[in-house]
Regions:
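C-terminal substrate-recognition regions of SAM-dependent nucleic acid methyltransferases
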Residues: 2-149, 154-206, 210-227
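Short, amphipathic C-terminal "tail helix"
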Residues: 228-233
Length: 233
């Protein structure tokens, strides 16, 4: 838990002194409270987000699907037969494409899905100061769809790109950026507003075939993060 308080002076414009406490250390800075739609608590995180934004114009909140990516509620179940495969909260089964009215453009593509709920106790750190963010991360093949239990992060023409995105979402870098906006257990496209879009083709400046730890280090270098910022993540 914790306590956050402020004094509001309604007729004053300008910067506000902000003091944060992390692991017994206090940091102070002058902040513009209206600079962003969301207020980032830790000053270290502000610097990281600023570096990411200075190197990217497009973020994953423009790619992640809305709730109900295929228009199917959580309680929808597979049919006895169908030309599609439906992923729902208890597994997979047949479904008919004639019943799909939303997300048709994604059906034939390779899709990466996540649960619309974060991992248990999201927002709370463990003894090492780490947070669990994504509770489910799967790939749907062409002709596979899902209920609103899941969000489609992105859809691709090739399996190579989908696998690269899957690796990207496993990095500490991405999960840290999601955590800054994931204050509740519900995930939505808005929570990906700090996650920079990447090139997942073979022409990418990141080698997605490497280990997750190595991909993390490539991303840290790409966005010019310092040793202290990497340690904070």
């Amino acid at each position: 838990g914790g306590v956050c308080y402020f004094f509001w002076v309604h007729n004053r414009n300008g910067l506000c002194e902000f003091v944060s406490r992390h692991r017994g250390k206090f940091k102070s800075s002058m902040r513009d409270l209206a600079a962003d739609d969301s207020f980032i608590r830790h000053l270290e995180a502000v610097d990281i987000v600023d570096k990411v934004k200075s190197n990217c114009d497009v973020f994953y909140n423009t790619r992640v699907s809305t709730q109900k990516p295929f228009g199917l509620r959580t309680y929808m179940k597979p049919l006895d037969e169908g030309d599609l495969t439906l992923k729902y909260n208890k597994g997979k089964g047949p479904y008919n494409s004639s019943l799909i009215e939303i997300g048709k453009e994604m059906i034939s593509k390779w899709k990466i899905t996540i649960s619309c709920l974060t991992a248990e106790h999201a927002g709370q750190t463990d003894k090492q100061g780490r947070k669990k963010i994504l509770s489910s991360l799967d790939m749907l093949m062409p002709n596979e769809i899902c209920t609103e239990t899941y969000l489609v992060v992105d859809a691709f023409d090739t399996e190579l790109e989908a696998k690269a995105l899957q690796s990207y979402l496993k990095t500490c870098f991405v999960r840290f950026l999601i955590s800054l906006l994931a204050s509740t257990q519900h995930l939505s496209k808005e929570k990906f507003a700090y996650v920079p879009l990447q090139d997942f083709t073979s022409n990418s400046d990141i080698d997605w075939s490497q280990s997750i730890a190595d991909i993390d280090h490539q991303l840290y270098a790409k966005y010019g993060l310092s040793d202290d910022e990497i340690a904070f993540i």
